[in-house]
Structures are given as structure tokens and as C-alpha cells.
Amino acid sequence: MDAIAARALSVVRACVTVTDARVSLDPGVMETLGIAINRYNGLTNHSVSMRPQTQAERNEMFFMCTDMVLAALNVQIGNISPDYDQALATVGALATTEIPYNVQAMNDIVRITGQMQTFGPSKVQTGPYAGAVEVQQSGRYYVPQGRTRGGYINSNIAEVCMDAGAAGQVNALLAPRRGDAVMIYFVWRPLRIFCDPQGASLESAPGTFVTVDGVNVAAGDVVAWNTIAPVNVGNPGARRSILQFEVLWYTSLDRSLDTVPELAPTLTRCYAYVSPTWHALRAVIFQQMNMQPINPPIFPPTERNEIVAYLLLVASLADVYAALRPDFRMNGVVAPVGQINRALVLAAYH
């Protein structure tokens, strides 16, 4: 499977470089395209040219790239255009060992496969408390029972209200609401001025403290917490106090936009509006894979096939589309009148 994806990626990337007839082709590009086009033409009865010049020739090369992307992703899209029919025999061309793949293409595919077979800490994009079902007003003292109470202010900040002389552990409060957190990096600070339940202004008592695994940590210092070591708070003073905890970032075993290199910019490229035709084609491919067709997903992709589709094949196909400038019709797509502008693009995403 890796070899087929790497061959498809190599061919698609090579096709980006052939649009200028005045430029001498790289020997590796000539070898890759020479063999790939010969195998593809033989199996599909197409007539793709290595140096496309006319509109029809550019269309043919783009259709070949589309066929190879769909074959590598194991996707059948059906009748989507009066000008294009998917050549299902393309997988036979990609399966042949004669088509070389370049080193970068195979490295990209192998890295994706390897990363998705294991787990490692990566920075999470959303706040640790995004899953909290309620929040409270910052700086408002509220301890309805007991001597301490913690609550969330927003997706990154929690506060602990403490009576005079109170102490307690806040592990459950500080731990993220979802996912397998590895390390949390936070700072804590006492709220100098806050309000009691009646709205009167109060000043936190001096001497409030936070310990992590029994070690005092200074206010304002970045603390690296493994979510296991006990985090204790104390207010030895004679007045009520509020401590604020701000999570700067945290790592988790969940997939993130850093799981593989350049995933975030490639998602942007995948979902960029190139033309109405490309917008529709990309949507059809993603719909067949049960992926978000128009807008990027809320959470980073978690499956190998999704990342291959995003990071390599569909983004590379967008580059080929921009380079070859194919002109073909998509069922149900009406060409816009006038120049593409922000308003038209915004309407396409809505």
C-alpha cells in the first residue's frame, strides 16, 4: 500500500513540473513520467502526453493524476462529469514495479504510516478545559460548602477559592477534561483583588502557596506537571484568597496537527478555493471517504488514509490543478460570472 501511494505521489508531483515547454525536465521526472504515462496509456486507452501544450493535453494529464489519486486512495467517485470517466484500471499501472518513486515521496508515506502505528506526545490545539460544561466569573469568591472550591473560567484558566487557613489538592481540577494528557505546562498566581459573594472588594491573604509533588513552586514560574504528581494549594493567612491557574499548553497522546510535518498548511491547501470545478471535485473525493468536504475538520485527522489524502494526494492534486489549469465540466457546477472574489468564495463555503 505504501508503494502504491508513493508512486502516485511521485507521478502527481512530477506532473507539476512539465507545464513549461522551454524548461529541460529533471532526469528523474522524465524517467517517472515516461514509464507511468506509458503504463497508464496502455491500460486505459488514453493518450497522455509528457509535455502537454494544448488545453486537451493538459486536461488528459490532469485526469491521469486524478485517476492515480483515486486509485491510491481506493475511491470510486462514479459519474461526476461529462468530460471525465474514472479509469479503474489505473491501479494496475500503480501496482507495477517498473514505475519508480522518488525518495521524498516514499519518506513522506512511510513517516505517515509509522506515526499512525504508534503514539507520542504532541501539543494540543484546544484548551484543556474546552470540554467543561460550565464556567464561573473570574475573581468572584464562591465556596458554598467546605473550605475550598475550584471552577473553570474559560478553556485555559481555572481558579481555586479558599477560606482562611484552608488547604487542598487540585489534581482533578487541573487535569484536562478529555484525552490522554502527558504533560501540562501552567503558571499560578494569587488574585490580588477579588469580590466576595456580596460584591465587596477583598485582598488575598499573603503567603498562599502551591506545591507540586511536595516542592514549592513560585507564582509566575512555568510548571511542567505530569498530571500524576499531587498538586496542593494552601492559604495559611487569616483572609480568604483566590488562586488562578493558567495552562499555557499541554501535550497529549491524541493526534494533532503536529503528528506529521506540514499537516496544518496542507489542510489549508486542500480546502483552498481554486475554482468552482476544483471545489466540487475535492468535495466529491472527500465525501466518498467520509471526510469533511468543504471546510476543514474540527479535530485533526486520526487515520492513516485521512492523512495520506490530506497531506499528500489531494494537496498535490491541487498543485497539479493550479499548474495545468484544466478546463472541464462538473455535474451541477455553474461557472461564475465575472472574476472570482472574496464574496463569491465566502458563499461557496457557506
UniProtKB/Swiss-Prot annotation:
<keyword id="KW-1152">Outer capsid protein</keyword>
<dbReference type="InterPro" id="IPR008980">
    <property type="entry name" value="Capsid_hemagglutn"/>
</dbReference>
<keyword id="KW-0167">Capsid protein</keyword>
<comment type="similarity">
    <text>Belongs to the orbivirus VP7 family.</text>
</comment>
<dbReference type="InterPro" id="IPR008935">
    <property type="entry name" value="Virus_capsid_a-hlx_vir"/>
</dbReference>
<feature type="glycosylation site" description="N-linked (GlcNAc...) asparagine; by host">
    <location>
        <position position="45"/>
    </location>
</feature>
<dbReference type="GO" id="GO:0019031">
    <property type="term" value="C:viral envelope"/>
</dbReference>
<dbReference type="GO" id="GO:0046789">
    <property type="term" value="F:host cell surface receptor binding"/>
</dbReference>
<dbReference type="GO" id="GO:0019064">
    <property type="term" value="P:fusion of virus membrane with host plasma membrane"/>
</dbReference>
<dbReference type="Pfam" id="PF00897">
    <property type="entry name" value="Orbi_VP7"/>
</dbReference>
<dbReference type="GO" id="GO:0039624">
    <property type="term" value="C:viral outer capsid"/>
</dbReference>
<keyword id="KW-0325">Glycoprotein</keyword>
<dbReference type="InterPro" id="IPR001803">
    <property type="entry name" value="Orbi_VP7_capsid"/>
</dbReference>
<dbReference type="InterPro" id="IPR023178">
    <property type="entry name" value="Orbi_VP7_capsid_C"/>
</dbReference>
<dbReference type="GO" id="GO:0005198">
    <property type="term" value="F:structural molecule activity"/>
</dbReference>
<keyword id="KW-0946">Virion</keyword>
<comment type="subunit">
    <text>Homotrimer.</text>
</comment>
<dbReference type="InterPro" id="IPR023176">
    <property type="entry name" value="Orbi_VP7_capsid_N"/>
</dbReference>
<protein>
    <recommendedName>
        <fullName>Core protein VP7</fullName>
    </recommendedName>
</protein>
<comment type="function">
    <text>Major structural core protein; binds to structural protein VP3. Constitutes the surface of the AHSV core.</text>
</comment>
